[in-house]
């Protein structure tokens, strides 16, 4: 079991918590992390890019001039890719970029990402973050005390107060435990787990 110190929002030690070694002390395999991140980013692509081929461009039905006798190069359509205003050859068409990654691989990658932050000592467990009111300055004050610079905060439940207070702060993101993903863990240098989210994460990855 991995033992981590639990702090309050004043960065005072409040206790210890045991983290499952099967989740937070997994050997990291970069190729698996790369695969899952690539799948995540591919799934986010809209894939709506499109150009018109010669079959899509309007017009071009009539032969511009007769086949022989003019001295000009033969032409069958003024929408040929060779012509100005003609169609595009092999241009991008709408497509789905997503590809399947097995559930076991996705879960393993999430464990590896968590283990990576734990091994780097960039995993912080906070008992809770409670602000007196919805104000950015209150969150910034807590972030400065905790030394958060580029941090992903994981909460057990959605907190509108916390979300609204931190949305104008750059390089900080709030997620609930069920939306935790490999890309965001690797994108943000610090991983801050609210104590209530830890057991939910372990139950999800068990």
Curated annotation (Swiss-Prot):
Residues 48-78 are annotated as: Disordered. Keywords: Ribonucleoprotein, Ribosomal protein, RNA-binding, rRNA-binding. One of its GO terms (molecular function) is structural constituent of ribosome. GO terms for biological process: translation. It comes from the Bacteria. InterPro entries: Ribosomal_uL4, Ribosomal_uL4-like, Ribosomal_uL4_dom_sf. One of its GO terms (cellular component) is ribonucleoprotein complex. The keyword rRNA-binding applies. Disulfide bonds: none annotated. Gene3D superfamilies: 3.40.1370.10. The keyword Ribonucleoprotein applies. Pfam families: Ribosomal_L4. Belongs to the universal ribosomal protein uL4 family. Part of the 50S ribosomal subunit. One of the primary rRNA binding proteins, this protein initially binds near the 5'-end of the 23S rRNA. It is important during the early stages of 50S assembly. It makes multiple contacts with different domains of the 23S rRNA in the assembled 50S subunit and ribosome. Forms part of the polypeptide exit tunnel. This is Large ribosomal subunit protein uL4.
């Amino acid at each position: 079991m991995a033992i981590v110190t639990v702090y309050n929002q004043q960065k005072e030690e409040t206790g210890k918590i045991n983290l499952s070694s099967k989740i937070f002390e997994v050997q990291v395999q970069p190729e698996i992390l790369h695969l899952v991140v690539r799948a995540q980013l591919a799934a986010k692509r809209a894939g709506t890019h499109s150009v018109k081929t010669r079959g899509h461009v309007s017009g071009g039905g009539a032969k511009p001039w007769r086949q022989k006798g003019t001295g000009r190069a033969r032409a069958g359509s003024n929408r040929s890719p060779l012509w100005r205003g003609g169609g595009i050859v092999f241009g991008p068409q709408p497509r789905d970029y997503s590809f399947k990654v097995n559930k076991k691989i996705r879960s393993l990658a999430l464990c590896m990402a968590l283990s990576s932050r734990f091994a780097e000592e960039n995993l912080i467990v906070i008992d809770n973050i409670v602000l007196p009111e919805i104000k950015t300055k209150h969150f910034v004050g807590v972030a400065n005390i905790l030394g958060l610079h580029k941090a992903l905060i994981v909460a057990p439940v959605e907190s509108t107060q916390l979300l609204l207070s931190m949305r104008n702060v750059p390089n900080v993101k709030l997620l609930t435990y069920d939306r935790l993903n490999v890309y965001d863990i690797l994108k943000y240098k610090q991983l801050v787990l609210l104590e209530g989210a830890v057991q939910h994460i372990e139950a999800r990855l068990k």
